[in-house]
Amino acid sequence: IGCAGLLMAILPKIISRWFAPNKRGFGMSLCTPGANFAALILGVVAPLVINGLGWNMAYVAFGIYFAFITVFVALTFREGPEEKGLAPYGAPKGTQAAPAPKLEEKAVASGKKVSPLRQVARMGITWHFGLFYAVYQLGYMAATQYYVVSMTGNGFDLATAAFSLTIGGVLTIITELVVGSLSDRFERKNMIGIMVACTGVLSAGYAIYLLNTPAPDLIPCYFFIALISASTGVITVIMSGAGEYYNDECRATGTGMIGTINIVGRYLGPWVAGIVIDATGQTAYAFVIVAVAMIVSCFIAFAMPRAATVQAKWAANN
């Protein structure tokens, strides 16, 4: 499960090679919905496989499936379009420059060795974006862990509560496609800030509703959970936005480091929410934590420098 976090390091680098800067949000929006499609499919397929093979052999079956995908990717995927004689999608014809020299090549020319990790660690945006992503993940994980529990704890059966995730999953796919393309037209950090603020407001609304309604109705619960889930489709913009703060040679290292920093929030979210729920006896307080985390991360996102500014500064210093 933890290996899924590798995408934070890999996808931004691949997308930046295959898509022109003004199409990277669109490119990322084509990739990230795959997880939501898989979740919807597995909701039907996984129980059938487990019932037929047992849970232990089901893991073996899925392992074989993943191995097949690995071989397929190794045989068919390419690092960049130039390997196939192509230009990045969206790049004007005849304007695609030759690949930028690698850091090692620059080092030979300048007489000094350059470490991508050192370059990334010295950039303020790495820690700024890492702080944002850690706080965001704290709220995100607190929400995902308690969507269903917030309904079952208020009298709804498990199947009814779980259906809210299906609705949210479909809306998330749509959101990822829309905001990914919109981020190609507007500053990505602003898109991130706006979407995260929406998550915070919706979470606060859901918490207030649960705390002030002795017997919550089905439709309002579906409404809040589905829209909170949909607003997390901003992950498309987060991944493409993080990658644009680095040049091609440092991009995987930079986004990988940001993805590592966010582990703090991923583990703290469910833990803190669980402690608060045990202390108060009400699941609604999990969404109070979500709201606070999202509003804080919203301000952190808006305070980020523009990607073009960071790139220009990096180029001037190197």
Go through each PLM region and give its residues.
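Cytoplasmic helix-loop-helix junction between adjacent transmembrane helices
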Residues: 1-34
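Extracytoplasmic gate region of multi-pass secondary transporters
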Residues: 123-176, 239
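C-terminal transmembrane helical hairpin of 12-TM major facilitator-type secondary transporters
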Residues: 188-241
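A late C-terminal transmembrane helix in Major Facilitator Superfamily
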Residues: 243-282
